[in-house]
Design a protein with these regions (language model features):
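Cleavable N-terminal signal peptides
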Residues: 18, 28-29
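Hydrophobic alpha-helical membrane-insertion segments, chiefly the h-region
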Residues: 24-25, 89
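Residues at the start of alpha-helices and the adjacent loop-to-helix junctions
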Residues: 8-9, 23, 331
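Sec-dependent N-terminal signal peptides
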Residues: 17-23
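Bacterial N-terminal signal peptides that target proteins for export
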Residues: 2-16
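Non-catalytic cap/lid and distal C-terminal segments of serine-dependent acyl enzymes
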Residues: 32-34, 42-350
Length: 350
């Protein structure tokens, strides 16, 4: 669901590269809505299908695109790691396949000896993969003439998009498909809004996901400057400053995070990693392995540099990269293989 406020304008988002290593038993209904089909011609190709599931967290039926690896049908007893890929703002559950060619990229990796995995690509609306600070107005959403998707699935009564991913989607995948079904075999990734979601969901649910990756993510939403990034950073501390930091995303983020710094800080990946460090020291689940990258011409490059500096200062291991490119599918297509390989390496030990 998008907050029913003036519709934000989508922000349009040289050669340099940096690479630094620094079960819930909810009732979920599943039904296949698309026929199985090979993702491309050839011997080692996966299949892509669409499920419709009931989400208790959102109170709505949602669509879910699922990639099954080439050997899924033949190896009837084999179990596979689960990867969850999140779309960006204004996207949908088909974008990673239709625009990102993620299925073809995964098939190519398998043909060169990569481990296989099941991939879930859920419909996240414009929900930022978080529990909103304010309850969405489903009735106003249904009356919104600009809305792009059917009201029954888009205008959800409960805006708990983090629980939807970490609980409902994972529960459906573990019960419907032959996943390995444990934390060590699950990873999550996303682009833009989905990059924010991948990192924050993994840091909020370290008992569910062992690894997370972000492409071009909104990963330091309170960052104000300097631009280009140089320490020390400046962060928004007032409502006016939060609005300035959010720019064209303000109508979304004020509904998701609120109008004061408490909600924004609680959903900041750097701050979440710092809090999780304390839980790890007290015997809690380990920190997820983290990777994130961004194009040097991307509007969010300074946010990514800030998160990299924050995690480095905290001593949180992570992999960070900058590559030529902007906030566009050409960039995400080019680098999807890197997040797949990073996640697969973490969930398979290879």
């Amino acid at each position: 669901m998008r907050p029913v406020l003036p519709r934000a304008v989508r922000c349009p988002l040289r050669l340099a590269a940096v690479l630094l290593l620094v079960g819930r038993g909810a009732s979920v209904l599943s039904a296949q809505t698309g026929s199985q089909a090979g993702t491309q011609t050839g011997t080692q190709t996966g299949t892509v299908r669409t499920d419709t599931i009931w989400s208790p967290s959102l109170g709505a039926y949602k669509s879910l695109v699922v990639y099954l690896p080439p050997s899924y049908r033949a190896a009837s007893r084999a179990r596979f790691p689960l990867l969850v890929y999140l779309h960006g703002r204004t996207g949908n559950e088909r974008h990673w396949v239709d625009a990102g060619r993620l299925d073809r990229t995964m098939d190519s990796l398998v043909r060169t000896g990569s481990p296989e995995a099941i991939i879930a690509m859920p419909d996240g609306d414009d929900g930022w993969y978080a529990t909103w600070n304010q309850l969405g107005d489903a009735n106003a959403c249904r009356a919104d003439t600009v809305r792009r998707e059917p009201a029954a699935t888009y205008c959800v009564p409960w805006t708990r998009y983090d629980d939807y991913i970490a609980r409902d989607i994972v529960w459906h995948m573990d019960t419907r498909y032959r996943t390995i079904g444990r934390r060590e075999s699950r990873g999550i990734a996303g682009l833009s809004m989905g990059g924010f979601g991948a990192l924050t969901v993994a840091l909020q649910y370290p008992d569910v996901f062992a690894v997370a990756a972000s492409h071009s993510g909104v990963v330091s939403p309170r960052y104000l400057g300097p631009k280009p990034f140089t320490p020390p950073p400046r962060y928004a501390n007032t409502t006016a400053e939060l609005q300035a930091a959010a720019r064209n995303l303000w109508s979304d983020l004020r509904a998701v995070m609120g109008k004061d710094t408490i909600g924004w800080k609680a959903r900041d990946p750097g701050y979440m990693a710092q809090r999780l460090q304390a839980r790890v020291a007290a015997g809690g689940p380990p920190l997820p392995q983290l990777m994130f990258d961004v194009g040097v011409d991307d509007a969010y490059v300074n946010q990514n540099r800030d998160l990299h500096a924050t995690l480095t200062r905290l001593g949180v291991p992570h992999r960070y990269a900058e590559w030529p490119g902007a906030h566009a599918w050409s960039y995400w297509q080019a680098h999807a293989a890197e997040s797949l390989q990073f996640l697969l390496g973490a969930v398979t030990g290879r």
